[in-house]
């Protein structure tokens, strides 16, 4: 079973990125001679200003698995547009059986989200958001569904550009 451990990892890197470990699982591979034990880690990395990435790593030791996951998260970063510490509009993300619904929140509301979603929002730089998950509570699926929702959120200027209109026409 996954252990939720959203704690900040500090390995002395000075790249200005926030790192959080979401889950560490003990995994086994059954071979002719018995079982081979190992660990799988799930982590997220963000700059606190709209860039976030997730990674997973496996190794026979926990620190090595976490390190691999952090490196993969750094390689897989995506840019998300934020507005005053929240998202622009309601958005839904899916991955497997996990469904994540997010809504912008007023200033001072804080991060109203549970489990792995909270860790993603903290490293992303979101300060006010309301999020709810349905279906699967698997941390990996929840993080992927959160990323799906964040990547599919758009700004008013992006919508206006797609429609060939001005931003004022969109809000009229």
Swiss-Prot record:
GO biological process: translation
One Pfam assignment: Ribosomal_S5
Signal peptide feature range: none
GO cellular component terms listed in the entry, alphabetical order: small ribosomal subunit
Domain S5 DRBM: 17-80
Keywords attached to this entry: Ribonucleoprotein, Ribosomal protein, RNA-binding, rRNA-binding
InterPro entries: Ribosomal_Su5_D2-typ_SF (IPR020568), Ribosomal_uS5 (IPR000851), Ribosomal_uS5_bac-type (IPR005712), Ribosomal_uS5_C (IPR005324), Ribosomal_uS5_N (IPR013810), Ribosomal_uS5_N_CS (IPR018192), Ribsml_uS5_D2-typ_fold_subgr (IPR014721)
GO MF term (any one): structural constituent of ribosome
Family per record: Belongs to the universal ribosomal protein uS5 family.
Domain description: The N-terminal domain interacts with the head of the 30S subunit; the C-terminal domain interacts with the body and contacts protein S4. The interaction surface between S4 and S5 is involved in control of translational fidelity.
HAMAP family registered for this protein in UniProt: Ribosomal_uS5_B (MF_01307_B)
Job description of the protein: With S4 and S12 plays an important role in translational accuracy.
UniProt-recorded name of the protein: Small ribosomal subunit protein uS5
Organism expressing this protein natively: Verminephrobacter eiseniae (strain EF01-2)
Name of the encoding gene: rpsE
